[in-house]
């Protein structure tokens, strides 16, 4: 028992000594090098505290690529075509907002976003002679916004161009009536203007334009319009460049009604006229046409809108002076229906010519009829109806001396 006690006592002292030695190293580590004695077991890093694990830095966000903005028209542009769209195009970002407005009134112009928000395009027409501001805000991939403001002005009023169409909208005319367009300014870009005017026949009939000058163009088909149909005329001329800086200032759609087919066949040799309605003979009358010094024009003439129940004809209007052969001073007539600008009419013959109807040609180129015949024409024939004259040695009227278009072969009419 005593030996065992003696054996245990030294071991207890050894443990105390060892613990004391370790304590000294740890304390010393607080003020010196933090190294462990070589006789201590190595630490297991996999069991270390969370604070001793290496931290992982988050992946840095790359900087946003700067947005590039292209605006049309460019800032400060003058004489912008009001029919052209205003565009904002963003690259490396989107168009967050766009406001296009009249700088004087604040009136805004609508627009739409396209290409996933990268492009804004105006959707409404602009006004002539107006200053506009265009404020565009873009956003980059990080959501950072930037605003760009520009101004521009549109074409001044002095460069507006328009036209007048004959016949007027909703008018009813005969089957031979060409459509005529008279422009306020010379048209240089004729193909562009033709493309902007769409003419549709209810029967599908197709015609062609024929330019008589830079300000006048007409349109007709190869044959007369079908009776009792309609034409639709779409004039989409707003913003169309006529040339010389002139810009079309309107768009409009008009309808023209086509009535019965009414054709007068005038025969100078037979000294008579026959009138057909829808290819059926309606009336025939004795007539007097142009004499040998003033023969009637041959070919086709279209009735104009000029009708006079009572009219005074003056010889001076056809170039005759007092003392000239054929000078008649002035005469009063009834039921005058104009066929040409140069003075060809269908009218009631003068009292002195009445006995010669159907017998002798006495006129200065007009078609003289009885009171009954001239009255019937006055009441029953309308603008766009046609007169076809044969049996006379004279040439046809000029195409623009009234409507002499039908004297031109269609192949020639349709060519430039």
Language-model segments: residues:
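Actinobacteria-biased recognition of intrinsically disordered, low-complexity terminal regions
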Residues: 1-10, 413-416
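Extracytoplasmic/secreted envelope proteins and their assembly/folding machinery
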Residues: 87, 133, 149, 180, ...
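Short peripheral tails and domain-boundary helices/loops at the edges of structured domains
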Residues: 160, 166, 262-270, 406-416
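Exported/periplasmic cell-wall-interacting domains
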Residues: 175, 298, 314-416
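Acidic, low-complexity Ser/Thr/Gly/Pro-rich repeat segments typical of extracellular/periplasmic
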Residues: 2-5, 13-260, 287
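Soluble periplasmic/extracytoplasmic beta-strand elements of cell-envelope proteins
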Residues: 70, 87-89, 133, 151, ...
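Short, charged beta-turn/beta-strand-edge "cap" motif at the junction between a beta-strand
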Residues: 138-139, 237-239, 279, 309, ...
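Gly/Pro-biased beta-strand-loop elements
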Residues: 246, 250-355
């Amino acid at each position: 028992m005593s030996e065992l006690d003696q054996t245990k006592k030294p071991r207890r002292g050894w443990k105390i000594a060892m613990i004391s030695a370790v304590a000294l190293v740890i304390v010393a580590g607080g003020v010196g090098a933090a190294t462990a004695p070589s006789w201590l077991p190595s630490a297991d890093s996999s069991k270390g505290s969370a604070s001793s694990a290496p931290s992982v830095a988050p992946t840095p966000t790359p900087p946003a690529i700067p947005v590039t903005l292209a605006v049309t028209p460019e800032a400060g542009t003058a004489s912008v075509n009001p029919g052209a769209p205003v565009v904002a195009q963003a690259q490396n970002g989107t168009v967050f907002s766009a406001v296009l407005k009249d700088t004087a009134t604040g009136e805004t112009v609508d627009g739409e976003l396209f290409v996933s928000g990268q492009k804004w395009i105006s959707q409404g027409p602009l006004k002539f002679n107006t200053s506009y501001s265009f404020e565009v805000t873009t956003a980059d991939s990080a959501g950072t916004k930037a605003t760009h403001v520009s101004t521009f002005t549109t074409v001044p009023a002095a460069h507006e161009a328009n036209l007048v169409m004959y016949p007027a909208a909703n008018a009813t005319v005969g089957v031979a009536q060409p459509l005529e367009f008279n422009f306020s300014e010379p048209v240089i870009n004729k193909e562009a203007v033709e493309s902007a005017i769409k003419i549709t026949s209810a029967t599908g009939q197709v015609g062609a334009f024929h330019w008589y000058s830079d300000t006048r163009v007409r349109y007709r088909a190869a044959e007369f319009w079908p009776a009792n149909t309609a034409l639709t005329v779409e004039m989409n001329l707003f913003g169309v460049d006529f040339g010389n800086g002139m810009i079309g200032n309107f768009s409009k759609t008009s309808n023209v009604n086509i009535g019965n087919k009414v054709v007068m066949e005038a025969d100078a040799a037979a000294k008579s006229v026959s009138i057909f309605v829808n290819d059926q003979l309606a009336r025939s009358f004795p007539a007097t046409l142009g004499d040998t010094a003033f023969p009637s024009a041959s070919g086709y003439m279209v009735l104009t809108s000029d009708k006079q129940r009572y009219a005074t004809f003056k010889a001076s209007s056809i170039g005759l002076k007092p003392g000239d052969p054929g000078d008649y001073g002035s005469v009063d007539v009834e039921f005058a229906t104009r066929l040409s600008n140069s003075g060809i009419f269908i009218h009631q013959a003068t009292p002195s010519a009445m006995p010669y109807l159907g017998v002798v040609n006495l006129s200065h180129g007009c078609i003289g009829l009885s009171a009954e015949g001239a009255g019937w024409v006055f009441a029953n024939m309308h603008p766009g109806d046609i007169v076809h004259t044969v049996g006379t040695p004279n040439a046809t009227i000029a195409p623009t001396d009234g409507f002499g278009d039908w004297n031109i072969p269609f192949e020639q009419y349709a060519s430039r």
